[in-house]
């Protein structure tokens, strides 16, 4: 009997392999070249183009165990995860597919045979649904399989429109579609619920375990259903559901995978009650988060990365709720790999990266989690009614990194509704503000619409004749311009590269007899290329022929920087890991800027390795080869694509030896040796999960190295040595400085002790207690604590308040001897004073410190101390 999830997966794939199906690996959770999908959410996703007739495989039968994620976008189960028996962010879909091979009878027979003979499920526990008018399916189930008529349930259009039914599948408004048949399992009458199609169908007694889709129509825009020439089959069975049945449990969270993960999470956090819903949330979320990172998604503030961030933060919040006091989530990865078996092969290969990324995100969120939860808790405690306003939800999102669904999760536990509409309004207002700021000083050309087309000749030439097809001035089409006029000139063909893919637009001239138009920038306007600039001499009109001449030096320097970004991208992936992907770039003649996904700062040793690797590839002088090919062929060759971009069916591929292959429309050097030298000038984080490297190449890199050498020699001269001795001499100077600082601190302690003897005489007695309140001039804040300790020793039973004002800041300290903390607490005392000087602070009952920003109020604040103490000592 197949019991474990791993055994069920193997049994399913082996059953269909033995029945002529090609076992195909699970595709990535990031759908390839399909921007309509946020994540892979069904087994058929990777075969979409096959079903549409746009792709052909060397097999007509396939079977998979597909990893899927449903969180964010149309298919979003996140809010329900942990609170129901069957909702998950991550699940595995077992499926078998026919591409114009077998159809209804074979598909139905395969499903029934696997369930009743391989898994030996009792037939009397199974019932099936079919589409209302699918008599063919009824005959197969009833006459050929032997399912009783009363156990075959017809489902009509139950979603308010023709063919809108639980039993009619559609890829979209048009395209392949058809009826489907679902197999249900009866958990028994001890669980509430009715058969599908009944008023009680939403109960948990009858659970759908397998959906068999018969793609037999091609839906037209008119709504007409035309028969497909080669009908196909798409099926799906959630492995978690069938595992629950085979393991004799009702909830998916009770199967082997989840039992293991829940137990491990409880052990790490220190929880004994394994029924906690928060443990379910954590166990579910580690699966989606770990596999998403393994497939190249990194936490960020946009797109797929933001969905990942939301899931991680929801898990961390539930861990916090259970009492977790340190990073715990990443520690579940080894257990996940172990329990997922063969399905975790890719995850095992990227385990170190996955753990680091999870830990970094968890630690980052932990810095704001407690404070954010405190603000949310206070808002909920003060709430009048049952709805939390959108402004508060937005503040938590904007300031403390709380995704709205995390706030909603907390509110749900207290039966509070979230004002989602108000949150969206606040979000829209922020977007408007950001857009307004971004548009400040925007050029009128940004909104220019040009209905023309320009051919690009700049891959092979930097000059050539062209005809002026349009001229735009101040956003309006004109027929001619005169000397001194600024304009956008459109040509029928141009060697000028228009800004795209991070590469800046070319500069140069358009010249003719007595005419010179200086091109300061080149931009794309739809299919047209616009040459932005000013007419230096002569008159220029539409229809005129000009010589288009690109500035060769600037283009050459830009090409050096563009080509090296490809080498840099490949080197980063080799040194840091294959999770690295390009997030943006800027390539101009002076420098390059490359943004990439990574969860932590790049170490100096790693940067050095990256730089050396790039320079090695430069010295190898690879020839740069470009080729036009189909997108699928390019991806099969391993071409890197910008994450989530939509590409045309034909793409341009740039290859540099066996080191780099990318999709790119930019201009490049002929050989990597042309780059000369690559030098990184800076590396920094620009957003959560996004790093930026700035660098220079060629002559600019040589100049940078020369400047560094000059500065090194200048430093050596200041240290009275040479370049080779700078480090040793600097270390000696730092050691000497530390010793001087130590001696200075000792001297300050002695001075404080001497000063304390003078200050003792300033103490007054209040109800038998020594009270010393003093504003000190010329005393550094770092000396206050030592001085307070000395005064306590001398005064024995005492209350002390000292304050200094330096450089626009106030520093305060309060000390209370142990015999008096029952009446006066140092934390309360110093907080009272700090509030009057624009500050805050606190500490222990016997000693507390504070700061402030209003030194002009210090005298008045200290004057309030004696009455405050007197009142408490009365």
UniProtKB/Swiss-Prot annotation:
Cysteines engaged in disulfide bonds, as pairs: none
InterPro entries referenced in this protein's UniProt entry, alphabetically: aa-tRNA-synth_II/BPL/LPL, Ala-tRNA-lgiase_IIc, Ala-tRNA-ligase_IIc_anticod-bd, Ala-tRNA-synth_IIc_core, Ala-tRNA-synth_IIc_N, Ala-tRNA_ligase, Ala_tRNA_ligase_euk/bac, DHHA1_dom
Enzyme class, spelled out: ligase
EC numbers, comma separated: 6.1.1.7
Annotated SUPFAM superfamilies: Class II aaRS and biotin synthetases, Putative anticodon-binding domain of alanyl-tRNA synthetase (AlaRS), ThrRS/AlaRS common domain, Translation proteins
Any one GO molecular-function label of the UniProt entry: aminoacyl-tRNA deacylase activity
Keyword Nucleus: no
Catalytic activity annotation: tRNA(Ala) + L-alanine + ATP = L-alanyl-tRNA(Ala) + AMP + diphosphate
KW Coiled coil (keyword) present: no
Cofactor, free-text remark: Binds 1 zinc ion per subunit.
Pfam families per record: DHHA1, tRNA-synt_2c, tRNA_SAD
Gene3D superfamilies: 2.40.30.130, 3.10.310.40, 3.30.54.20, 6.10.250.550, Bira Bifunctional Protein, Domain 2, Threonyl-trna Synthetase, Chain A, domain 2
Stated family: Belongs to the class-II aminoacyl-tRNA synthetase family.
Domain notes: Consists of three domains; the N-terminal catalytic domain, the editing domain and the C-terminal C-Ala domain. The editing domain removes incorrectly charged amino acids, while the C-Ala domain, along with tRNA(Ala), serves as a bridge to cooperatively bring together the editing and aminoacylation centers thus stimulating deacylation of misacylated tRNAs.
Protein name: Alanine--tRNA ligase
Primary gene name: alaS
């Amino acid at each position: 009997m197949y019991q474990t999830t791993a055994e069920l997966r193997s049994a399913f794939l082996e059953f269909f392999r033995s029945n002529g199906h090609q076992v195909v690996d699970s595709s990535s959770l990031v759908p390839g070249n399909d921007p309509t999908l946020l994540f892979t959410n069904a087994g058929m996703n990777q075969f979409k183009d096959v079903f549409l007739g746009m792709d052909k495989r060397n097999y007509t039968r396939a079977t998979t165990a597909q990893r899927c994620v449903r969180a964010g976008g149309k298919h979003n189960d996140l809010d329900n995860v942990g609170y129901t028996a069957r909702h998950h962010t991550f699940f595995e879909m077992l499926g078998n597919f026919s591409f114009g091979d077998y159809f209804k009878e074979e598909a139905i027979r395969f499903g029934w045979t696997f369930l009743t003979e391989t898994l030996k499920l009792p037939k009397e526990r199974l019932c099936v649904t079919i589409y209302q008018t699918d008599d063919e399916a009824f005959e197969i189930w009833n006459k050929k399989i032997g399912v009783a008529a009363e156990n075959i349930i017809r489902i009509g259009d139950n979603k308010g429109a023709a063919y809108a039914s639980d039993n009619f599948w559609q890829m979209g408004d048009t395209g392949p579609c058809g009826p489907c048949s679902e197999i249900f399992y009866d958990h028994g009458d001890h669980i509430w619920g009715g058969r599908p199609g009944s008023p009680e169908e939403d109960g948990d007694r009858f659970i759908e375990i397998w959906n068999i889709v018969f793609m037999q129509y091609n839906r037209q825009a008119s709504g007409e259903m035309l028969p497909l020439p080669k009908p196909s089959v798409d099926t799906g069975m959630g492995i978690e559901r069938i595992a629950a049945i085979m393991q004799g449990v009702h909830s998916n969270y009770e199967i082997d995978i989840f039992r293991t993960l829940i137990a491990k999470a409880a052990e790490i956090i220190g929880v004994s009650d394994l029924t906690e819903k928060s443990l379910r949330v954590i166990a579910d979320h580690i699966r989606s988060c770990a596999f998403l990172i393994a497939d190249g998604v990194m936490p960020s503030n946009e797109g797929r990365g933001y969905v990942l961030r939301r899931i991680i933060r929801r898990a961390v919040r539930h861990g916090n709720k259970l009492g977790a006091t340190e990073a715990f989530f990443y520690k579940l990865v080894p257990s996940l790999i172990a329990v997922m078996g063969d399905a975790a092969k890719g995850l095992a290969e990227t385990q170190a990266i996955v753990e680091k990324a999870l830990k970094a995100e968890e630690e980052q969120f932990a810095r704001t989690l407690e404070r954010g939860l405190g603000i949310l808790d206070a808002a909920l405690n003060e709430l009048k009614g049952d709805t939390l306003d959108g402004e508060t939800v937005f503040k938590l999102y904007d300031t403390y990194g709380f995704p709205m669904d995390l706030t909603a999760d907390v509110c749900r536990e207290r039966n509070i509704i979230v004002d989602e509409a108000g949150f969206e309004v606040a979000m829209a207002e922020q977007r408007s503000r950001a857009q307004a700021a971004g548009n400040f000083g925007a050029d009128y050309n940004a909104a220019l619409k040009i209905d023309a087309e320009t051919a690009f000749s700049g891959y092979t030439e930097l000059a050539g004749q062209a005809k002026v097809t349009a001229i735009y001035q101040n956003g309006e089409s004109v027929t001619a311009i005169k000397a001194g006029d600024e304009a956008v000139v459109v040509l029928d063909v141009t060697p000028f590269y228009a800004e795209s893919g991070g590469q800046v637009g070319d500069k140069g001239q358009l010249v003719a007899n007595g005419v010179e138009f200086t091109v300061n920038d080149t931009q794309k306007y739809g299919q047209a290329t616009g040459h932005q600039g000013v007419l230096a001499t002569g008159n220029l009109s539409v229809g005129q022929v000009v010589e288009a001449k690109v500035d060769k030096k600037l283009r050459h320097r830009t090409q050096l920087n563009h080509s090296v970004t490809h080498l840099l991208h490949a080197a980063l992936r080799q040194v840091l890991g294959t999770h690295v992907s390009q997030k943006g770039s800027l390539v101009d003649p002076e420098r390059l800027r490359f943004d990439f996904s990574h969860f932590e700062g790049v170490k100096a040793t790693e940067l050095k390795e990256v730089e050396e690797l790039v320079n090695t590839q430069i010295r190898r002088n690879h020839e740069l080869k470009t080729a036009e090919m189909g997108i699928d062929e390019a991806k099969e060759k391993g071409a890197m694509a910008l994450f989530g971009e939509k590409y045309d069916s034909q793409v341009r591929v740039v290859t540099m030896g066996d080191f780099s292959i990318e999709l790119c429309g930019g201009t490049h050097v002929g050989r990597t040796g042309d780059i000369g030298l690559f030098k990184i000038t800076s590396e920094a984080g620009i957003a959560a999960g996004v790093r930026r490297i700035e660098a220079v190449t060629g002559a600019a890199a040589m100049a940078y190295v020369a400047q560094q050498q000059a500065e090194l020699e200048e430093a050596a001269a200041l240290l009275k040595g040479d370049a080779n001795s700078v480090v040793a001499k600097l270390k000696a100077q730092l050691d000497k400085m530390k010793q001087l600082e130590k001696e200075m601190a000792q001297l300050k302690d002695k001075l404080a002790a001497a000063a304390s003897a003078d200050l003792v005489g300033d103490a007054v007695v209040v109800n038998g207690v020594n009270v010393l309140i003093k504003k000190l001039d010329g005393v550094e804040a770092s000396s206050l604590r030592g001085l307070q300790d000395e005064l306590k020793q001398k005064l024995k039973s005492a209350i002390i308040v000292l304050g200094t004002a330096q450089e626009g800041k106030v520093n305060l300290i309060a000390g209370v001897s142990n015999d008096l903390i029952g009446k006066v607490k140092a934390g309360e005392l110093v907080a009272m004073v700090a509030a009057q000087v624009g500050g805050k602070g606190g500490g222990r009952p016997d000693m507390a410190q504070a700061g402030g920003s209003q030194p002009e109020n210090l005298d008045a604040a200290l004057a309030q101390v004696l009455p405050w103490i007197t009142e408490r000592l009365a």
